Amino acid sequence: MAKYLAQIIVMGAQVVGRAFARALRQEFAASQAAAEARGQAGRQSAAASSFTGMTLQEAQQILNISTLTPEEIQKNYEHLFKVNDKAVGGSFYIQSKVVRAKERLDEELSINQQQQTKNKHADEQQQQT
């Protein structure tokens, strides 16, 4: 009786050990994929900053945006663009800064959307394994 009990315990420990090892490998693979995705997003964001000549923080300050939502960006852009129109005594320089800020934020939204799509596909592939 004790012999069978010991065998059951050993077999149970082996099953749990294998399951734990498999889960650990999957978690490690997922964390590596996430780290790679974050690294790529950082490179894309840096490229967008050099292309537009403006950092994400500068663009957010110019358009007075705290969260990146397309509606808020468009609303603030339209308001600031109209207010700074040269015909109503505004500044062309500031108006051009507003345009560049919107371009930079639109680029960041595009990068974020691409990352979400890639992450979604990676999650689907991971769930299939």
Curated annotation (Swiss-Prot):
<feature type="region of interest" description="Disordered">
    <location>
        <begin position="110"/>
        <end position="129"/>
    </location>
</feature>
<keyword id="KW-0472">Membrane</keyword>
<keyword id="KW-0999">Mitochondrion inner membrane</keyword>
<feature type="compositionally biased region" description="Basic and acidic residues">
    <location>
        <begin position="120"/>
        <end position="129"/>
    </location>
</feature>
<keyword id="KW-0813">Transport</keyword>
<dbReference type="GO" id="GO:0030150">
    <property type="term" value="P:protein import into mitochondrial matrix"/>
</dbReference>
<dbReference type="InterPro" id="IPR005341">
    <property type="entry name" value="Tim16"/>
</dbReference>
<comment type="function">
    <text>Regulates ATP-dependent protein translocation into the mitochondrial matrix.</text>
</comment>
<feature type="region of interest" description="J-like">
    <location>
        <begin position="58"/>
        <end position="110"/>
    </location>
</feature>
<keyword id="KW-0653">Protein transport</keyword>
<keyword id="KW-0811">Translocation</keyword>
<keyword id="KW-0496">Mitochondrion</keyword>
<dbReference type="InterPro" id="IPR036869">
    <property type="entry name" value="J_dom_sf"/>
</dbReference>
<comment type="similarity">
    <text>Belongs to the TIM16/PAM16 family.</text>
</comment>
<protein>
    <recommendedName>
        <fullName>Mitochondrial import inner membrane translocase subunit tim16</fullName>
    </recommendedName>
</protein>
<comment type="subunit">
    <text>Probable component of the PAM complex at least composed of a mitochondrial HSP70 protein, GRPE, TIMM44, TIMM16/PAM16 and TIMM14. Associates with the TIM23 complex.</text>
</comment>
<dbReference type="Pfam" id="PF03656">
    <property type="entry name" value="Pam16"/>
</dbReference>
<dbReference type="GO" id="GO:0005744">
    <property type="term" value="C:TIM23 mitochondrial import inner membrane translocase complex"/>
</dbReference>
